[in-house]
Amino acid sequence: MKRLLVLCDCLWAWSLLLNALTERSYGQTSSQDELKDNTTVFTRILDRLLDGYDNRLRPGLGERVTEVKTDIFVTSFGPVSDHDMEYTIDVFFRQSWKDERLKFKGPMTVLRLNNLMASKIWTPDTFFHNGKKSVAHNMTMPNKLLRITEDGTLLYTMRLTVRAECPMHLEDFPMDVHACPLKFGSYAYTRAEVVYEWTREPARSVVVAEDGSRLNQYDLLGQTVDSGIVQSSTGEYVVMTTHFHLKRKIGYFVIQTYLPCIMTVILSQVSFWLNRESVPARTVFGVTTVLTMTTLSISARNSLPKVAYATAMDWFIAVCYAFVFSALIEFATVNYFTKRGYAWDGKSVVPEKPKKVKDPLIKKNNTYTAAATSYTPNIARDPGLATIAKSATIEPKEVKPETKPAEPKKTFNSVSKIDRLSRIAFPLLFGIFNLVYWATYLNREPQLKAPTPHQ
């Protein structure tokens, strides 16, 4: 009896195990069948959508205007080339429109497709008006996305890198601001056939990623959107425009240009504190500073396009050059008057010639005796001369000529009044110029000169 019960339990356990395995196998088969059914349904929907579809014709042809809604997500902005007046931007460009021919009904509400389907349906012929070169990314496959909803609304997204023109006004360089446009629209369809609109409100239609700035010399202040109509010989076309507002960073130019110019001007004014007789030293100061300013002015223009007007930096360099050249002219003036022997009051200084002193004759006891003659008669040999020697005795005595008190002579080892005046005038004028210059440009409100589409 016990053996029978054990056998029954074993049979019951085996039956449960077989039942579980059977249900699991049936579930897997059911899932595979369901997946196979979904794939089949998906394929049938696509085949039915493309059956009789002509991608050469726009949606609503002859009935309505095709509305294309767009928005842009900027993944990378920059770099910006001042010399070529262009910038590079990497974007996800999204377009959405409605095509009633692509309506469908099925278990899914959205068909998520790739670029293969995009080539079989009608898509807008959008191009960039100010684009110099546009590249659609194809690695590892074309970076395109297509989604079709059951009511026939399509979302078409692609990744693009665009190099576009950016007209720049460099009058305020390097304190300038710019509005770089990105213009796009239909190439073949006029506004009577295809119109463009922004998907969202203007503030959200164009978004820049937080880490999307690739700018070394600019700050991206923001972006604005606009739309307009452009008239051409083939009709009127809708043009969508996005302006990216840029402000230049001045730090690089302060280090590379402004500070060297200021130091060069200060160095040229050091010569005012040297003696006017130090011709070699003052000449070296003047010539060296002039050549330095010439080199700085040339290097400052290398990174800029050859514009026909003067920039703010050009005016600063020109004034600094004028100060340096004026310091050299000032030394030439001082040296001219020094060589001519003229002082500041206009009186000439004539060096006094030394007077010749003649040997005087001294009269003594009605007898002239040469003061510088040393004559001793030999009285022993000539006794007759004893009497003469008594009456005419030679007294060798040095007689000093009468001299007048010397007048104080003017010396040239002094400071010129021109130098004294220049020591005050040059630094004062240069300081006033810097005060006016920086106050004018740094406190100026940015004036964004953005070209507007023709209405």
Curated annotation (Swiss-Prot):
Signal sequence region: 1-27
UniProt protein name: Gamma-aminobutyric acid receptor subunit alpha-1
Organism: Gallus gallus (Chicken)
Subunit structure, as described in the record: Heteropentamer, formed by a combination of alpha (GABRA1-6), beta (GABRB1-3), gamma (GABRG1-3), delta (GABRD), epsilon (GABRE), rho (GABRR1-3), pi (GABRP) and theta (GABRQ) subunits, each subunit exhibiting distinct physiological and pharmacological properties.
Function comment: Alpha subunit of the heteropentameric ligand-gated chloride channel gated by gamma-aminobutyric acid (GABA), a major inhibitory neurotransmitter in the brain. GABA-gated chloride channels, also named GABA(A) receptors (GABAAR), consist of five subunits arranged around a central pore and contain GABA active binding site(s) located at the alpha and beta subunit interface(s). When activated by GABA, GABAARs selectively allow the flow of chloride anions across the cell membrane down their electrochemical gradient.
Cellular component, GO annotation: chloride channel complex; dendrite membrane; GABA-A receptor complex; postsynapse; postsynaptic specialization membrane
GO molecular function, one term: GABA-A receptor activity
GO process annotations (BP): chloride transmembrane transport; gamma-aminobutyric acid signaling pathway; inhibitory synapse assembly; synaptic transmission, GABAergic
SUPFAM superfamilies: Neurotransmitter-gated ion-channel transmembrane pore, Nicotinic receptor ligand binding domain-like
Swiss-Prot/TrEMBL domain comment: The extracellular domain contributes to synaptic contact formation. The GABA-binding pockets are located at the interface between neighboring alpha and beta subunits.
Gene: GABRA1
